[in-house]
Amino acid sequence: MILGQIPEYLEGLNPEQLEAVCYEGNRLLILAGAGTGKTRVITTKIAHLVKQSRFLPESILAVTFTNKAANEMRERAMAIEPSCERAIIRTFHSFGAWFMRRNANAFDLRSEFSIYDEDDSAELVHSIFPAFTKRDCGDYAFLIAKAKDYCLSPDSPNLDFISRHPEFRRIYSAYEDRLRSTGNVDFGDLILMPALLLEKDETIRNRTRQRFRVILVDEYQDSNIAQFRLLQQLAGPDSMLCVVGDDDQSIYRFRGAEVKNILNFPKVFADTRIIRLERNYRSHQAILDLAHSIVVHNENRLGKNLLATRPGGNKPKIAFLDDQDQEIEFCAHIARQHVKNEGAWKDIAILYRTNAQSLGFERLFPQFDIPYRIVGAVRFYEREEIKDMLAFLAILANPRDEISFKRVVNKPSRGIGASSLDKIISFAFHNGLDLIEASRQLIAS
């Protein structure tokens, strides 16, 4: 790009950001440290590809891990180039659902299939094995989801990696049989089933690759094995593939994230260009130095050194305390000192690792006369009334959705007991009927 002819939307980018946006090779790994402007880079790159008339918006696929991030990515790209509204910018799971509904016949599914979340999966386990406790059902649902993250089927020889429980293979197999018989899928299927279909069906694979000539992935360090396999099938030899991530921020191993996906990216995808974003616009240097002093001991990392653009800043303090009560008292002391020095309560945020830890603060803070507000205790879609309404809608769209049917069949109360409910489900299953029609026929008889 000739100096002096830079478009307005590229102004303000630092040299590394500009290089990442304008790079035209087929394989690009952007190592973006915290606070280095990666969201601006990836959204500007989407708009830049369209503005330069290299690609149609419809040929661009951008995936990330949360709806909030996907919405922000879309809005910021559209602010630069409105036609980016036509690009496919979604979460991995949302893209998987989009892909499966458009290829439903290839999956032997109806396009109106229901998608089971973690609670639904646990309920399905319980419907198959009613003697299991609620906790056991949740544990098995979690293990099944984990198996799918690692692309392991019930007959996989490596399933012991997930669980050595002698009954797990049978439970997983029964769960899959029931899920398929009802024509529904769970969250893990939204990644695994498209990946497996694209691997075996050359026609659909080629058609999909022709559709999506550009693939961008945000927060790549959080990707799991199934998502990696899906990405391998989506990106053809001539596709432009750009992933953005930070191997130093890979903290979701317990959810199945595989840091090797980003560490091995240059080995798996030949001729990869690596661009490092190391200018931090968020934190002071003291915080960056503290973080670096810890993460530098990781043996397997691609490496980068963050430099703060903000001057000054206080050094972080680390306190070693004996128990949670002492931690809470320490936080209370710091908070009261801040207010005593003419600060405000609203200036203070306290982060804790698990929701259960909030109980200690709720118990002790009133004793210290400290006002507080807990943020994000219950997610909108986890509220009972919201899940009930979604279940009613799911039944309208897919009358074979057993889990949604069981959730709302007695809301409001209709006097349908467990025995009657089992009879409806069994009658539907053995006669190839949906649950609404099965109910009608049983009532008529």
Regions found by a protein language model. Give the residues of each.
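SF2 helicase catalytic motif II
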Residues: 208-227, 242-243
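Helicase P-loop NTPase motor core
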Residues: 30, 34-42, 104, 270-273, ...
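Pre-Walker A adenine-sensing motif
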Residues: 11-22
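Conserved RecA-like helicase ATPase core segment
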Residues: 2-12, 44, 48, 161, ...
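Motif I (Walker A/P-loop) of helicase-class P-loop NTPases
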Residues: 39-48, 73-74, 227-228, 331
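ATPase/helicase motor core of nucleic-acid motors
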Residues: 95, 268-269, 311-315, 341-445
